[in-house]
């Protein structure tokens, strides 16, 4: 599914503060990284990013607390590998927030167009959504230092 559009809803570079421990999230960076649909309004994006930050921060709350107890006041102070001058932990956090934001927006996109072609598009989005949720879980597990094996019992 193509999520690019020549239209733009004038997404401003709003900065979402993720608390004192986690890095801030920039709306324009999200939009550039995740190839958002031009129909995305600033209000929808704000809601989706805010919700994703809340959920990811809750998932990582015990890990965050253990890092603070070790003396690390913020994620970027934790010893980690660096990629392009940024901590891999910060990059993984961003991936988790961006993927959850996009998964939530994509899930809601499916119910917008109820025509036959819209129904076929919606069916095709299932795989994309599953991959985004997988990316969220893998990023969270990597931040926690866990492997990203997911086992399903039959």
What residue ranges belong to the model's regions?
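A short linear-motif detector with a strong N-terminal bias
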Residues: 1, 76-77, 84, 129-131
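Short loop/turn elements at secondary-structure junctions
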Residues: 86-154
